[in-house]
């Protein structure tokens, strides 16, 4: 564990502190407070280094809770213009890759947030070379059984239809309907049934429970969660991440830094 930082180039630390002070000066932060923050907080220091082009990407977390890390990050790093910040997890099993969101940030997303998350997931899926097929998940499938808890998912579908997006989507549906081809006979009207590779969860708790159960009980390879929508190439490692998990996150952060124009 790193308890303190040793700055090998003190002038660079002054530059990063100056950058962060300019960002936070109208949010109640004095210059000496920001200088102390850069010296003592690895997230503030690392993200400011990336913003000042003194680093390309960053992986943080691992020894603190994910929520604590994301809250610190959101104070010093903005989201990408027009995007929400959320967690997306990749799961690879039987030669198929599935993207699941939001697994880590928003407890109970609104219909509009589900729409925004789905569009960001599609952007990421295309970066990874996938043809996105988006399923909005629920405990019901196309209105059966009826429940007020599924209405925000159904509303998200209607909102997305109005936007005339360039990807296939459908819902609401249960996960087995989204993933298993046997259900195509029951729902021949849907292009997504049995073909989904992007799963939009109705809430964070259902997403987190699902992917952690799969990670613990199956042979599926789980990568992430990846932090999507942040204005810099930064990933947060969950508590007690393994060496291979850290390497995966570092590779994805580096890839993001290379292919995404964060200055837009």
Residue positions per predicted region:
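Anion-binding alpha/beta catalytic cores of soluble intermediary-metabolism enzymes, centered on
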Residues: 1-264
């Amino acid at each position: 564990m790193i308890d303190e930082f040793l700055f090998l180039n003190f002038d660079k630390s002054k530059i990063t502190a100056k950058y962060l002070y300019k960002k936070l000066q109208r949010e109640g932060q004095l210059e000496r407070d920001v200088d102390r923050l850069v010296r003592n907080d690895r997230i503030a220091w690392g993200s400011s280094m990336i913003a000042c082009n003194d680093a390309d990407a960053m992986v943080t977390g691992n020894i603190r809770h994910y929520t604590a890390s994301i809250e610190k990050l959101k104070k010093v790093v903005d989201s990408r213009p027009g995007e929400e910040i959320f967690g997306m997890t990749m799961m690879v099993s039987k030669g198929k890759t599935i993207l699941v969101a939001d697994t880590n940030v928003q407890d109970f997303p609104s219909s509009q947030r589900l729409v925004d998350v789905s569009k960001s997931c599609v952007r990421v899926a295309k970066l990874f070379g996938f043809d996105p097929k988006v399923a909005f998940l629920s405990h019901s499938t196309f209105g059966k059984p009826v429940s007020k808890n599924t209405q925000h998912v159904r509303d998200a579908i209607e909102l997305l239809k109005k936007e005339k997006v360039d990807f296939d989507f459908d819902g609401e549906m249960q996960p087995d309907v989204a993933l298993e081809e046997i259900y195509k006979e029951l729902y021949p009207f849907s292009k997504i049934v049995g073909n989904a590779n992007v799963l939009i969860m109705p809430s964070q708790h259902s997403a987190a429970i699902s992917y952690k159960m799969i990670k613990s009980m199956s042979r599926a390879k789980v990568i992430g969660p990846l932090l999507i929508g942040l204005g810099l190439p930064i990933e947060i490692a969950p508590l007690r991440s393994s060496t291979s998990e850290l390497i995966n996150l570092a590779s994805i952060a580096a890839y993001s830094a290379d292919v995404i124009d964060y200055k837009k």
